[in-house]
């Protein structure tokens, strides 16, 4: 299968730099699949699972916010946060879910706290889901 150059970069550093056969990411408009020869584009990322096919093997990651760009066969994924499935601390994700649900259930929570808790809950659920896709 044909490959393309893929870089996954966050503010914490480089997560991946190499060839890939396929990338599927969640954008704010829905899922975007990228193969070699994809047209140039820029898209804002939503929150979801990223699937990267490398040497015939699929790897999964929790990809939150940011941008994806395709330019002349080079793909750059620049999410706000990115964690490969095997790097996710599932216990921490479950703790985050519990904290967010407590805030959402508190009648005294401010509108700002509720919005932040909703985002935290969504991130926690995505991280839990992706952690279940660890390559074996």
Listing of model-derived features with the role each one plays in the protein:
Residues 1-5, 133:
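N-terminal export/targeting signal detector
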Residues 82-136:
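Acidic/glycine-rich phosphate/pyrophosphate-binding loops and surrounding catalytic core
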């Amino acid at each position: 299968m044909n490959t393309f150059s893929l870089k996954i970069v966050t503010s914490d550093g480089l997560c991946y730099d190499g060839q890939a056969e396929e990338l599927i990411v969640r954008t704010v408009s829905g899922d975007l699949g990228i193969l070699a020869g994809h047209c140039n584009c820029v898209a804002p990322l939503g929150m979801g699972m990223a699937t990267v096919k490398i040497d015939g093997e699929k790897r999964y990651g929790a990809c939150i916010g940011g941008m994806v760009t395709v330019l002349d066969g080079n793909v750059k994924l620049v999410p706000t946060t990115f964690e490969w499935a095997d790097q996710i601390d599932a216990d921490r994700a479950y703790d985050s879910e519990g904290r967010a649900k407590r805030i959402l259930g508190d009648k005294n929570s401010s509108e700002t706290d509720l919005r932040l808790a909703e985002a935290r809950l969504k991130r926690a659920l995505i991280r839990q889901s992706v952690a279940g896709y660890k390559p074996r």
